[in-house]
């Protein structure tokens, strides 16, 4: 069980009178510290890889710019459920083509999802397809998903997720990952862009795909993405005009500094990234493998912590407003976002409540002070993690908890 805390925002770009970082007015150069695990969608489930895939592969459904709602991408309709709720039928557009001239039909759609499950790569998104029993293709433009869950409300989100890119069955392997060189050489793309060149985690080149018939056509002809080792190098690239746009990830301090630079424009919006505080059900206070297991008391401890976290303080003081307080499992900007935690925990308006936490513990018969062990990774989730967890420790201790931080 996790406590949603923060959701990210912000990208930075240089403001220029003309031209671009590449020297070509038609080329946009993007800088990022993200890493790409795999260009093949079956081999990755991370932001860096998805940033490549979402630009070169089509989906049945996607989000248009500036909206959280899903709309048809290469689908021709919104899909329909059977009367018994076990089959979801999608019609796809006719005459679809990959950049290499291969036809894109329902067979490619079925192939794309089936291979994710068959390959079941340890870094891949196969877990997202757990509710899909099987897929049928009665004709070239019809796909039928047989669902294990009746009227599964998450299915369309899954079809638009990292498990959802549609690939060319004439190029991709059915039972193993296909390397980036082969994918590029065979032009196996049907998304807004074509990946024209790629050197792993160094540079990627994209050109507009004129045959794309989906929701979000490219608005420029060429994009170049440069990959940086860390945020300090990315910040320097912005300041020196080496990139037009910096997206994922600059530190809060970097963004704060760049926002004061008249040559740089900082754009803020929903980022889709979340930060959670997660409990281990086994070893948390009163956990299943603790000295005194008790499900009701364990739940009370989790609820008490949820009542004590000051999300606004973390967002402002630690992350300098590059994150926003989050009161949902689903971040702002994605379908299904609702601030349900805002009224469920704390004072009902987004702030913490020590009194409410105390009552929850008392009602469950939990003795105080509660001893908590917080553990975090100092670099994997950003350089501000140490400050974030120090602030969390202080918040919990102020309310009387005893916190060990590692």
Question: What are the residue ranges of the model-derived segments?
Answer:
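N-terminal lobe/hinge region of extracytoplasmic solute-binding protein
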Residues: 31-81, 114, 188-189
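Aromatic- and charge-enriched surface segment that lines or borders ligand/interaction sites
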Residues: 77-122, 138, 144-146, 294-297
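Surface-exposed binding/hinge segments that line
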Residues: 126-172, 197
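Gly/Pro-rich hinge or "lid" segments in bacterial periplasmic/extracellular proteins
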Residues: 160-216
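Ligand-site clamp/hinge motif
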Residues: 210-257
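Periplasmic-binding protein-like
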Residues: 291-336
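Structural transition elements
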Residues: 324-363, 379-385
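Ligand/substrate-recognition segments at binding pockets and active sites
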Residues: 361-395, 405-406
